[in-house]
Amino acid sequence: MRNATSVKERLKNYAKKNNRIVQDIFTVYVLERTLYRISVSDYRDKFTLKGGILLYVLFAEYFTRSTTDIDLLGAKISNEAENMKAVFEEIFSQECDDPIVFRMDTLKVSNITEFKEYHGLNVSILAFLDRTRIPVSIDIGFGDIVYPDRVEMEYPTLLDDDPAKMYAYSIESTIAEKFEAIVSLGEANGRMKDFYDICSISGKRDMDGALLQAAIIETFHHRNTGFEEIVAFDEGFCEDPLRASRWRGFLKQKNVLAPIDFTDAIETIQKFLNPVIQAIREDNSFSGTWDSAIRAWK
């Protein structure tokens, strides 16, 4: 097993070299090793990686908000809390070469009520890297679809540990789910991360318009969400002082390295997704190609 003190020093050096906060890097390392344990367990095929930690991997140094938890889609596995607790007791009990210690007496599984049709679960546990205490939180959703199919990926490592090999969301489904959340929450939306993530993706990944359109249609239909009204694109939405304050608070909390104005973020998302949504409303196919370098459809 690796020496905990040595690992901490290497992580501190990594943080210094990359101008990152040390505690953030400790958290990323623990989440990375958590995913590794899932990937070598008997439950690897039951989970699909999604959310902020997936974007952190896809865009590496270009994804500039810190991520503090893991988001998974569960399939062909029980969404009952006691059953999931038994699953993660087994996952966290595995012996691995890294120095992370999980305190099994702190393992908790609770219901998440925000999911529409199927209740989700939150798995939480305390991990220790030497004497440094790092909370681990895993949100697991159920019942969603991934279009195109999920992809197999190798999760990059901060040091030279064995990498996690897991299934992950397609980027199209990632955008579709985040946009559906924006639309369905409407005026009550306080999830700033969805706006930030879509805006970030639009500047870093070229997109096939047909695939993106299909993913949005599948996701919205599956969640019974319509395309008629998008409150976030109304003129007054981004000008609301409380919402702008929440946005600034989100950027600060997540240690975003390149902050952008909320109005600019909304305008970018509109430019990115409005043509696709308009085609859906008119029952037309959309076949453009998104050029992330100039943030425009071709």
Descriptions of predicted regions:
Residues 1-47, 56-66, 70, 74-298:
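Structured mid-to-C-terminal alpha-helical surface segments
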